[in-house]
């Protein structure tokens, strides 16, 4: 983990929320094959070339899972105050029906899941509540594979854990559509 912390080109972009700029509450980095641009939260990310360590992780993961990943989003949670809000990884650049592999390194954190809100016109059911959500405690070295339907039906997020002082890295290997 120390090698990744030191060798990655970390950024803390700003996003527009209700007309105001806010720093993303974590550090991020985007790596991938040439042409694997990725837009989320209104930001366009150009891929940095794979480092040797990241390329080796990609190779090992691809062999183990029988999947071909061409991009990687890294999130660095410096302590328990860094977090990620509710979202689904459903951007049009992502290859449909391709799983996302999420590798956790460092401090344990709880990844929360809740049913994805449906448009009001389509849903006659009650809105999702906290009782409908669940958490997965992800420890150092855990690998979570989110198969394609996950993003269609669920949102996920990483809430703050304010007493936590240790760092956590999350590496999410993805497949971007190529032109």
Regions picked out by a protein language model, each given a short descriptive name:
Residues 1-179:
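Non-heme Fe(II) oxygenase metal-center motifs and adjacent flexible, charged/small-residue loops
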């Amino acid at each position: 983990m120390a090698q990744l912390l030191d060798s990655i080109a970390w950024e803390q972009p700003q996003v527009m929320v209700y007309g105001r700029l806010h720093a993303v509450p974590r550090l991020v980095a985007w790596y991938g094959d040439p042409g694997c641009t990725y837009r989320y939260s209104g930001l366009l990310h150009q891929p940095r070339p794979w480092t040797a360590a990241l390329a080796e992780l990609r190779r090992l993961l691809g062999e183990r899972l029988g999947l071909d990943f061409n991009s990687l989003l890294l999130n660095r949670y410096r302590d328990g105050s860094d977090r990620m809000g509710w979202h689904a990884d459903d951007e049009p650049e992502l290859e449909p029906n391709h799983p996302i592999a999420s590798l956790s390194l460092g401090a344990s954190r709880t990844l929360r899941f809740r049913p994805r809100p449906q448009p009001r016109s389509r849903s006659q059911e009650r809105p999702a509540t906290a009782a409908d959500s669940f958490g997965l405690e992800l420890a150092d070295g855990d690998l979570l594979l989110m198969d394609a339907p996950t993003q269609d039906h669920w949102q996920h997020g990483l809430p703050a854990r304010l007493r936590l002082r240790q760092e956590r890295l999350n590496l999410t290997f993805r497949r971007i559509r190529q032109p």
